[in-house]
């Protein structure tokens, strides 16, 4: 529970019901967790696991915002998932610098998945994305990168 335990006492807003968080408002202040797979972003469109382009505009906006301290992402592999989610992300990162805004990621899948977990991780790491072994570890690293854990 990122907002109520790891960020105790720190303002946190989200578009999904996370214990300890408030709803996102237009005048964002503090830390924000946005689930781009939520119905709000996928209505009439495929989930980002299937079509990662669904999150391209929101990601570009976050990376262009000097107030963004870190971007936390997860990639889910398997049948029905995008053929190359890491490759898609990398193709959208023209001009991105890990020093400016780090991206922390986790990859859920196996070597038996069509996308091969190790191949996806290698692509992300080669581009400077910090990859952890689980989404919980990625959340902790994202918190640490902005001095909160």
Report each predicted region and the residues it spans.
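A short helix->loop->beta-strand "cap" motif at the edges of active sites that frequently abuts
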Residues: 98-102
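Active-site rim loops that border cofactor/substrate pockets in soluble metabolic enzymes
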Residues: 15-67, 75
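Charged helix-capping and loop-helix junction motifs
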Residues: 85-92
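Short acidic-hydrophobic, aromatic-tinged amphipathic segments that line or gate anion-handling sites
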Residues: 130-138
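Glycine-rich, proline-tolerant flexible connector loops at the mouths of alpha/beta enzymes
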Residues: 75-83
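Short, small-residue-biased leader/transition segments that mark boundaries at the very start
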Residues: 2-4
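Glycine-rich, charge-decorated loop segments at or immediately adjacent to ligand/cofactor-binding or catalytic sites
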Residues: 104-125
